[in-house]
Amino acid sequence: MDIHQILKLLPHRYPILLVDRVLEIETGKRIKALKNVTINEPFFMGHFPKHPVMPGVLMIEAMAQAAALLSFSTLGVTPDDKTVYYFAGIDGARFKRPVGPGDQLIMDVELLRMKAGIFKFKGVCRVDENLACEAELMCTMRTVA
C-alpha cells in the first residue's frame, strides 16, 4: 500500500502522519509498515536539537496508525467524515533503543482480538532488525455526529 492509498484511509496529515508505506498486510491478522525518519521531522527541533531522538510516544502513534489500517482492512470498510478511529489504551510499553534521523522504522502490528468494536493489538517497532519499542494497543472505531 503506497502513500496515496494510506491518505485515503487515515485522516492524519503532516506533521502527524507516521506511516509512509505498508509492506505487508494479512487481513484479520497482521500488518508490516514503515516510517522513514528524516532530519526534517518537526519534532527534532526540540527533541533534542544536539542529539535528535524520535519521541517514544510517536513510535506508539505510528503503531496505532498501522493498526488503524489493519482494522479497516479487517472490517472491509473505508472511513468517511463521520468515522473516527480512537486510540483507547496502551499496556506494557517499552523503549529499547533511540530512533533518529536516517533510520527506517518498521512497525509490525498483530491483531490479538476484536470484540464489540474494540481492537487489541501487539506492536513492535524495529530499526535494522533491532527492537526499538513494543507495546499492546487498544483502539476503537466510532461514528461521530
From Swiss-Prot:
One of its GO terms (biological process) is lipid A biosynthetic process. CDD domains: FabZ. GO terms for cellular component: cytoplasm; membrane. The keyword Lyase applies. Transmembrane segments: none annotated. Its EC number is 4.2.1.59. It is found in: Cytoplasm. InterPro entries: FabA_FabZ (IPR013114), FabZ (IPR010084), HotDog_dom_sf (IPR029069). Pfam families: FabA (PF07977). The active site is at 47. Keywords: Cytoplasm, Lipid A biosynthesis, Lipid biosynthesis, Lipid metabolism, Lyase. It catalyses: a (3R)-hydroxyacyl-[ACP] = a (2E)-enoyl-[ACP] + H2O. One of its GO terms (molecular function) is (3R)-hydroxyacyl-[acyl-carrier-protein] dehydratase activity. Involved in unsaturated fatty acids biosynthesis. Catalyzes the dehydration of short chain beta-hydroxyacyl-ACPs and long chain saturated and unsaturated beta-hydroxyacyl-ACPs. Belongs to the thioester dehydratase family. FabZ subfamily. This is 3-hydroxyacyl-[acyl-carrier-protein] dehydratase FabZ.
